Design a protein with these regions (language model features):
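A structural motif detector for beta-strand N-caps
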Residues: 25, 30-33, 37, 43, ...
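Terminal amphipathic alpha-helical/low-complexity segments used for targeting or macromolecular assembly
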Residues: 1-30
């Protein structure tokens, strides 16, 4: 995940990545996740993907896969029901 605490004025500004049950988001080292984005549960973010400002990705009901080089723009919410 290309986000370095040293590159932000406030080291506490990191994406909110939350487990849900036994599932935890997995983010590629080359993906960008904005500091105020939220990832929950069974979510994977592929290489070169971007999750932009205010986006929420909820894998609490079923898996969500954000493919390589995809992007989710500002303030979008992604959620899926089984």
């Amino acid at each position: 995940m290309t986000h370095s605490a040293s590159s932000t004025p406030d080291a506490a500004r990191v994406p909110l990545v939350l487990s849900y049950g036994q599932s935890r988001p997995v983010v590629s080292e080359t993906a960008f996740v904005a500091p105020n984005a939220t990832l929950v549960g069974d979510v994977s973010v592929g290489a070169g993907a971007g999750i932009f400002y205010g986006a929420v990705v909820r894998g609490d009901r079923s898996p969500l896969r954000i493919g390589a080089n995809s992007n989710l723009q500002d303030n979008v919410t992604v959620h899926s029901d089984p």
